[in-house]
Amino acid sequence: MAAEGRDSRIPVAILGATGAVGQRMVSLLAGHPQLRLAEVAASERSQGKTYFEATRWILPGDVPQDARGLVVKSVEEALGSRLVLSALDAKVADTVEPLQASRGRLVVSNTKSFRMQADVPLLIPEVNADHLALLDRQQWAAAGGGIVTNPNCVVVGLAMALAPLHRAFGIEAVCVTTLQALSGAGYPGVPSLDAQGNVIPFIDGEEEKIETEPGKILGMLENLSLIHI
């Protein structure tokens, strides 16, 4: 049993904590029973400020109390938390996520950068939890680090519906139509004139992700190699 007054929850760091996705992560960690927000990191203009000072909060309600006083660190800084959630833009994630993994950090990434890399799990726990075994193949394994990615938001729901059908009968083709919120293009999102009369005109790269990611998620793991469907 943990000593009285000691917080036994797992400490977590968030990369890109001041952006829209990072703010959502901060919000979800507020009062979490097993995870504790311990560190926040963001771009150079935010470094050295408290999270409250650095963030233009766009979610309903106030900045969570346990995040307000955290001092924003550099995304390249050595972090004390072994579990790192990444909400970075892809261009930054390309270098920062491997850097943190090489320091023994387990990076759980919301970014597209490493989703299709052969030894990186593209994870939906209810569908392909066994793919976590790929972590043992990663170049950062000896240091105790690694990268796990989550899929595109449309692909999550799609793959969860397709997985039991694929396992029972096999799938030859799927036709998909999506209607997506304006926030899917990021904050501040799509200009209002472009959005009139449409859910959202276009999100770059969305169709390609829906075409490629399910094949990896539904693939089979054999001898620590992933065979896509």
What are these regions (language model features)?
Residues 2-203:
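N-terminal Rossmann-like NAD(P) cofactor-binding subdomain of oxidoreductases
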Residues 171-174, 221-225:
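Short, structured loop/turn "capping" segments at alpha-beta junctions
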Residues 191-224:
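Active-site/ligand-binding loops adjacent to catalytic centers
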Residues 227-229:
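Conserved small/polar residues in nucleotide/adenosyl-binding loops
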